[in-house]
Swiss-Prot record:
Pathway: Cofactor biosynthesis; (R)-pantothenate biosynthesis; (R)-pantothenate from (R)-pantoate and beta-alanine: step 1/1. GO terms for cellular component: cytosol. Homodimer. The active site is at residue 41. It comes from Nitrobacter hamburgensis (strain DSM 10229 / NCIMB 13809 / X14). The reaction proceeds by a bi uni uni bi ping pong mechanism. Beta-alanine binds at residue 65. The lineage of its organism: Bacteria, Pseudomonadati, Pseudomonadota, Alphaproteobacteria, Hyphomicrobiales. Its EC number is 6.3.2.1. This is Pantothenate synthetase. (R)-pantoate binds at residues 65, 158.
């Protein structure tokens, strides 16, 4: 039976555990999560084990990245299942602080992100989101002091924002993006997929199918504006409320007029029922 990872819930216990992990000059990889772990998270852990000799997984449902009308209260919390998966994956340490540890009553500091990565995508529809993400990730980096940190590319804009923050603030952390892990029908794995009804789950892979078709058409030379309009129409016709379906430069997230403008990423966000799904694909 796999050995359960050590668990730290206070800063002193985290520091003691990290001192033990760093004995003999071990390198440390951090995988930040909000729990409700799936195979996408475990892919991050597998990559982490290749990149460092010790792996820390944080589990913290961060309230500051949720707006009042969003799903903080109902976000899946599956501690026992998560710990079983992390034991099987042979994770060394789980950092599981509570809200009071991360945000004491007198907490008064935020990290605000600017620049090209704030590109009118998630930041437009969830204006609170990146301030919360940058602040909690900055704290996790300060607490755990990892050599590398791994982020899934499903949250592509988040990956770019965190990479920029780590560079700008000289945090000394190498940020590694890990490709999206998908279900057999193409749906990007997400903890929020648990919200989908059977009918919604059957429709959800439409997003990936539309992006694959759009990417193929663009590679074949079709007009970008026409391709994106066709894809948006298909998404809406399938029953989604579309926030955006856009083609952006894969590095800067600047808008592009054609795939000749550089490496291109297609990004989508849409709601089916009350569940908001995001996805992206390279062209």
């Amino acid at each position: 039976m796999p050995r359960a990872p050590a668990i730290a819930r206070t800063l002193p216990s985290l520091r003691r555990a990290l001192e033990g992990l760093r004995a003999r000059r071990a390198t440390v990889a951090l995988v930040p999560t909000m729990g409700a772990l799936h195979d996408g998270h475990l892919a991050l852990v597998r990559q982490a084990k290749r990149r460092a000799s010790k792996v820390v997984v944080s589990i913290f449902v961060n309230p500051t990245q949720f707006a009042p009308h969003e799903d903080f209260g109902s976000y899946p919390r599956t501690w026992k299942a998560d710990m079983a998966k992390l034991a099987e994956a042979r994770v060394d340490l789980v950092w599981n602080p509570d809200v009071g540890t991360m945000y004491p009553p007198d907490f008064a500091t935020r990290i605000l992100t600017e620049g090209p990565a704030m590109a009118g995508l998630e930041d437009r529809f969830r204006p609170h989101f990146f301030g919360g993400v940058a602040t909690v990730v900055g704290k996790l980096f300060a607490q755990c002091r990892p050599d590398v940190a791994l982020f899934g590319q499903k949250d592509y804009q988040q990956f770019k924002v965190v990479t920029r923050m780590a560079t700008d603030l000289d945090l000394g952390v190498k940020i590694i993006g890990v490709p999206i892990v998908r279900e057999r029908d193409g749906l990007a794995m997400s903890s929020r997929n648990a919200y989908l009804s059977a009918e919604q789950r059957a429709v959800a892979p439409t997003l990936h199918r539309v992006m694959k078709d759009a990417a193929k058409r663009l590679r074949n030379g079709d007009d970008l504006e026409t391709v994106m309009a066709d894809g948006a129409g298909t998404i809406v016709d399938a029953g989604f409320a579309l926030d955006y379906f856009e083609a952006r430069h894969a590095e800067t997230l600047a808008p592009v007029r054609s795939i000749k403008d550089g490496p291109v990423r297609l990004l989508v966000a849409a709601k089916i029922g009350t569940t908001r799904l995001i996805d992206n694909i390279g062209v």
